[in-house]
Amino acid sequence: MSCPIHPRRLFLCLLISLTFFVVDPSSQHIEVKKKQMREKVREMFYHAYDNYMTYAFPHDELKPLTKSFTDSLSELGNLKLEHLPTDYNGSAVTLVESLSSLAILGNSTEFEKGVLWLSENLTFDIDARVNLFECNIRVLGGLISAHLLAIDPNNRLIQGSYNNQLLRLAEDLGKRFLPAFETPTGLPYAWINLKNGVMENETTETSTSGCGSLVLEMGALSRLTGDPRFESAALRALRQLWRMRSSLDLLGTTLDVVTGEWIEYSSSIGAGVDSFYEYLLKAYILFGKEDYWRMFHSAYLASQKYFRHGPWYHEANMWSGKPTYWQLTSLQAFWPGLQVLVGDIAAANSSHREFFHVWEKFGVLPERYLLDHQIIHPTMKYYPLRPELAESTFYLYQATKDPWYLDVGESMVKSLNLYTKVPGGFASVRDVTTMQLEDHQHSFFLAETCKYLYLLFDDSFVAKRNYIFTTEGHPIQVVSSWHEKLPETYFSGNWTLSKSGAWESRASALSLQVCPLISLNSRHPEQQRESACHVLDEQINHKCWSNKECGVDATTCRLRTCSGVGYCGLWNPL
């Protein structure tokens, strides 16, 4: 920087120049730490990926202890695999799942090699019975995400020619899903044979997640191909599922797709239901359809009312709202990340700290933890390298920039390397009390666990453009052309949609910088980011005659009540 030598300006110029050289020591330390941890996560990913490619590819997943493979996509639905072709080698699920992670790590060479191999070798014309939900989030989602990354010129991932090969594979797979939706209710079967459709005497039982978490992938497929059947089928199923909710706006865990009757009445944010909530919100962000927001808002309020107990979330009967099971499940650890997206930062932080406390207690997160007894569930002591806690840690750091979350990520990286890393990859933990290992490296370890830990320490990928991540961690870029109704204000880091009534102003959390009641724009302080659970009092002066005129608090998500002197507030203790 050159300065004009002028007596009156010399001092000011020196001050300006010095600002370019003064560095906050704590900030510098954080950046050094982030860089070091990023490289450690990179090493983790490639240790898992290279061993898969060496010992398991093109089969589905790696067995790291024996350095062999499992064709898990088919084995999920086939206890006996005699009917499979003798030359069946799986569907390269781990490769499909790894493509978006390779893109985020900037490995264009390996990304292009993977795309080329899949284009020339992958086929779904196989006599294999697969789980619709798992195949959708892992394979269909992986192909769609990789296709979108491949055609984005900013990524420069493909040096040769790319002619939508991954999209054609995704379209073929999507068409093979459609027979599953041919039920009296429109709710899809949980299992589908990729070659022959729904098998005779197929089970009619499925989960809420299984039929309510398909709309992101199938909706994106319709937008990309112009074929409306995929999104229509997924949306019809989702709406039917929502019509089956109780008067409390709660849904059970399992149901019958033919009769439309509930089988398991226990409702929760955990296994069997978790991604239902996630996809309602993310579908609203991705497609802008108001129905998604209305469903999510009602479901979210109900979850806060009937499941929340301090920082924990127990299960409750969908009809009565009374608690059923007081247990933490590892899949629930996604919830703080979802709360970040709707702006409930305080609640997200509170729950996240409790999950991490359990992680610290055992070294990893057990599958089920009994809250009332503070012990591990006797038959569910395993940890299959799940990503949900890493995912929420990433979101909370993005929202707060609190370096404590970097410490959490560092602790997780150390634990994974200490307890689960073996010469042949990363192994699941069979029993967290003994750290006995299991011979399985799930594909989601590369698709999600490593990805979210990497993004925690290096967010340059999400800083460039708006993405939502599917429940399997596959990024899909948010583009205005996919919105039914464009936001009134659109800009690169976020978007705002102004409305009338109780929802006077709201912002989706695409920039991951959302907190309740923080001004969107310093020039327009009346525009504020509200949490999803925030419902305004009917009167602007907060006066009331009854509880019906009071709303829901934005920070705690608690119902406000009318006091004896006629004002709405948080008068009742927890």
From Swiss-Prot:
Residues 27-574 are lumenal. It is a single-pass type II membrane protein. The keyword Transmembrane applies. Keywords: Endoplasmic reticulum, Glycoprotein, Hydrolase, Membrane, Metal-binding, Signal-anchor, Transmembrane, Transmembrane helix. It is found in: Endoplasmic reticulum membrane. Ca(2+) binds at residue 471. Residues 1-9 are cytoplasmic. The chain crosses the membrane at residues 10-26. GO terms for cellular component: endoplasmic reticulum; endoplasmic reticulum membrane; endoplasmic reticulum quality control compartment. This is Alpha-mannosidase I MNS5. The lineage of its organism: Eukaryota, Viridiplantae, Streptophyta, Embryophyta, Tracheophyta.
